[in-house]
């Protein structure tokens, strides 16, 4: 049975996400243009910036496009948008059954041949359940696109947050949600649109890389391809902004654009003892 819940007047991500921007919004939002047409997030992840801009009324009367190559993430967005009540009911069942045995049983669904025959609501519930109960909130897959994150040690994980799901559903009602590569933004974006890229970061060290958000790698070659897309969007008059790691490789690549240093507290990390405040950069063109 679904509870009657008042939708929050503020909006926030319904999943935790590696590199999520909730703690950086106060530093990123002042770097955005005051005026823009449509809004694009081609690496949406948890969507923290989108939800904050929506909450502030800054996306009113604008067309919004959220992309991600991660098919399970995008399915979850679409289910939150279209079927929030069904999702809440399913998550309540997951919550009631939560245990170590249940976690690994649910995680193993993507090893089954009929995984994609499961309903969209079932798959979205699995995705959110694993996100809320796995080790450090990671989403990581192997080369076969199978989730391989162990269970976390949370005593009382918040598996089903009614209010967050309902408010997110409200925010997503008129949004275009697409399971496509970030490169597709070139087909949609036009002059004076705002494009915010939040890609898998270029690693600070050889051992610091974490790019397994999907079965697709995002390494040096892919960073250079992103740079070319960034330049092309700038040439057609888009407002383009990107978050990335504070590395010489990235700063040299974008040396002809404005680069701002910001500071992040990173709380999601596969090595909990390596958490802490680190510098990041925000790159933007000047339209």
Please place each PLM-identified region on the residue numbering.
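SAM cofactor-binding core of SAM-dependent methyltransferases
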Residues: 35-114, 158
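Short His-Asn-centered micro-motif
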Residues: 42-43, 67, 178-180, 197, ...
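Short, polar loop motifs at secondary-structure junctions
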Residues: 45, 164-165, 244-248
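Short active-site oxyanion
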Residues: 36-39, 61-63, 172-176, 230, ...
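SAM-dependent nucleic-acid methyltransferase catalytic core
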Residues: 2-27, 81-196, 200-210, 225, ...
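Long, positively charged, glycine-interspersed low-complexity recognition regions
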Residues: 216-287
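Class I S-adenosyl-L-methionine
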Residues: 1-24, 34, 262-271, 276-282
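Glycine-rich helix-loop-beta junction characteristic of Rossmann-like nucleotide cofactor-binding loops
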Residues: 29-35, 57, 187-188
